[in-house]
Swiss-Prot record:
Gene: plsX
The protein, known as: Phosphate acyltransferase
E.C. designation(s): 2.3.1.274
One GO-annotated biological process of the protein: phospholipid biosynthetic process
MF term (GO), any: phosphate:acyl-[acyl carrier protein] acyltransferase activity
Organism: Azorhizobium caulinodans (strain ATCC 43989 / DSM 5975 / JCM 20966 / LMG 6465 / NBRC 14845 / NCIMB 13405 / ORS 571)
A family per Pfam: FA_synthesis
NCBIfam families hit by this protein: plsX (TIGR00182)
Length: 355
């Protein structure tokens, strides 16, 4: 029998704090009864909500913290004010100390990444971590990274992301040789910024052991599922992610308006209710909520700050799956066997985003 999964929760993170986080944790607990939780935050705010869920209370332990990292705090501010004593820091520190197998937070992205880097450090051979998101596509699902950890990327960091994304796809999707594409403004080899073109040249001509390089892909290829892993720098990746989420909400809004316009439309909806329910579920961004911080010596999951309980539960589910699939071990093995010797070049700029 497998050992229980221990997940550390930043109960104060996100736009709504424990009012959303704790119901989300309860939903995840029901799906994964072999899980225990460490809840970091203001005990006076946590305990009354936790009392609504007796089974979760039994499976949890509250660790009181006095400091909450604000959603608008810059990473440098968050580190100065919240290092060692905030719910976010203590949540990550539980992973470092071996008290938890994964940390989940809906807090400020830039602050969470900064604290995770300082506390957990990056794996040997990795210059900078990346945030990987599981993306619904016409073919099923794919992985897109980076979706917001850094702005800009060197050719070396793009190659590192290709290695980490490939390892994650093999783990999560059970694919022996997942295809990897570099996001670009065109598929032609002469197009794009120099860093992307150089990374493409290395992957295409020199190769990286175990990376099944497809070539350049464009924005429309993400939703089509042309490749299993899409690699890009964090600025473009975050815009693509937010655009896709906004488009899904826009389509859902259009459908609701169209199906309630006339009695014929309402009748058509009733006749095709099951099909529309399946479509609504497919378009629901909460199902894919949660980004994995790849390249760190520990599992850290970032939930959207404005999500609801179901969305936060999906982020906890993701952390559970990463632990059960032993993602860190697989990435470490991939780095040792695949990473080419190459200069890192200039470092990208750390993202300051908070969503």
């Amino acid at each position: 029998m497998s050992a229980p999964v221990r997940i550390a929760i930043d109960a104060m993170g996100g736009d709504h704090g424990p009012e959303v986080v704790l119901p989300g944790v309860e939903l995840a607990r029901v799906r994964h009864p072999d899980t225990s939780f460490l809840l970091f935050g203001d005990e006076a705010a946590i305990r009354p909500i936790l009392a609504r869920y007796p089974a979760l209370s039994t499976a949890s332990r509250i660790i009181h913290t006095d400091v909450v990292v604000g959603m608008d705090d810059k990473p440098s501010q968050a580190l100065r004010r919240g290092r060692y004593k905030s719910s976010m820091w203590r949540c990550i520190d539980a992973v470092k100390a071996g008290e938890a197998d994964a940390a989940v937070s809906a807090g400020n992205t830039g602050a969470l990444m900064a604290m995770a880097k300082v506390n957990l450090r990056t794996m040997p051979g990795i210059g900078r971590p990346a945030i990987a998101a599981i993306w619904p596509t016409l073919r099923g699902e794919s992985i897109v990274l980076d979706v917001g950890a850094s702005i800009g990327a060197t050719s070396q960091s793009l190659i590192e992301m290709a290695i980490m994304g490939s390892a994650m796809a093999s783990t999560v999707f059970d694919i022996e040789r997942p295809t990897v594409g570099l996001l670009n403004v065109g598929v032609e080899e002469v197009k794009g910024v120099e860093e992307v073109k150089e990374a493409g040249r290395i992957l295409r001509e020199e190769g990286v052991a175990g990376v099944n390089y497809f070539g350049f892909v464009e924005g429309n290829d993400i939703g089509s599922g042309t490749v299993d892993v899409v690699v890009t720098e964090g600025f473009s990746g975050n815009i693509a992610l937010k655009t896709a989420e906004g488009t899904a909400k826009q389509i859902a809004s259009y459908l609701r308006a169209a199906l309630s316009r006339t009695w014929r439309a309402k009748l058509g909806y009733l006749l095709a209710r099951d099909a529309f329910a399946a479509l609504r579920e497919k378009l629901d961004p909460r199902r894919s909520n949660g980004g994995v911080f790849l390249g760190l010596n520990g599992v850290v999951i970032k939930s959207h700050g404005g999500t609801d309980a179901e969305g936060f539960a999906a982020a906890v589910d993701l952390g559970y799956d990463m632990v059960r699939h032993r993602l860190l071990e697989r990435i470490e093995k991939s780095i040792v066997t695949r990473l080419p010797a190459a200069g890192r070049g200039s470092e990208p700029v750390e993202a300051e985003g908070s969503s």
